[in-house]
């Protein structure tokens, strides 16, 4: 699925990530980001780009995005190796 938000959407940062990380997420979501819905939590998603995975919540009331966690993503090469190892 692809998630896209308006440029003026507020990105909340309760964990205090540096501004560069918040800007990276905002730019990713504004452009349209590949995302996976958390099957056990409504309105929670993993959003990723080439470098990072972001765990976010999108408020159904305000539309605000809450950045809850960030971790390094897998490179395309690592994904291919994992895919081939399980095939």
Describe the residue ranges of each PLM region.
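A short, surface-exposed loop/turn module that caps and links secondary-structure elements
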Residues: 23-49
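Solvent-exposed, well-ordered amphipathic alpha-helical segments
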Residues: 20, 24, 32-35, 57-59, ...
